[in-house]
Amino acid sequence: GKTADSEMLLENSLYGLPQGSAFTTKGQNTYESASAILGQQGYTSAVFHGNYKSFWNRDEIYKQFGYDNFFDASYYDMNEADVSNYGLKDKPFFKESEEYLSSLQQPFYTKFITLTNHFPYPIDEKDASIAPATTGDSSVDTYFQTARYLDESVKSFVDYLKKSGLYDNSVIIMYGDHYGISDNHEEAMTKILGKDYNTFENAQAQRVPLMIHVPGVQGGVQEQYGGQVDLLPTLLHLLGVDNKEYLQFGTDLLSKDHKQLVPFRNGDYITPTYSMIGGNMYNQQTGEPIATETKEMKETKEKVAKELELSDSVLQGDLLRFYAPDGFKKVDPSKYNYNKKKSTDSSDK
């Protein structure tokens, strides 16, 4: 699922399925998502995306999540010059989104899904502000140009947020949804990194950027092992929402009690000291193989397998239809309609 699995992790703190996309196969399930939880705290919710609403079954599963608004490609000027790869380029996407964002009733919870910095990383010459890399692998070479283009589009959007007054009144989370370059590009990545792009290095390349802006908080770098499954608990705590009664597999990244264990969907995992990659153990700090699996490592492997099994049970059995925390009202998907409309007030549901 990649992107769709990432959204499942972000919105629900549930893992994707071992096969297929839960967005497609479990699109009618009951969920206790970020948009539903925050909606019952008075937040208007919206998704902005420069592709069409049916992609990844978003037009159906977002109703199960309780999203008030979904601004898909039908809301944007999809002229040929501004469309590339999977949809609208990031710069016109953010620019055209400003009007819709400003029309939302505050407070709001919104999500922007960008497209330009996505495999195979095509970019028009007029949009590239830096030279490509020179590995001879076109996808690796243009990756950096599309990343720079994304950076420039985000800067322009942040400038708008500051000018409009939203920046100083918003928690902003920026993250990557999945890896950029797969292990099929080993030779080119070896040239880029200046070292062998082996199994261990490929696992490290699964890391994605995560930046959190909180008004009034001094910026800095926090060294922490975590995954996308931890984003929802972190966001809820930043907004003062108690998540103890919700079924979530992640923990608050900013808490002293955060568990520094990152499960992969295939049962592999990473910790600050050791990792299991492809069933083999490695020293996480040096990348050196570990010949003998210790008792602690075996217990960690079993813990990861159990956590994935429990998450699968929730999705496969649609178990959240049987449970809701006190005070939480289950989402009624029939209230939501994402056909293009003039008003974006949440009362139009």
Task: Describe each PLM feature range.
Residues 1-349:
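Solvent-exposed soluble domains appended to multi-pass membrane proteins
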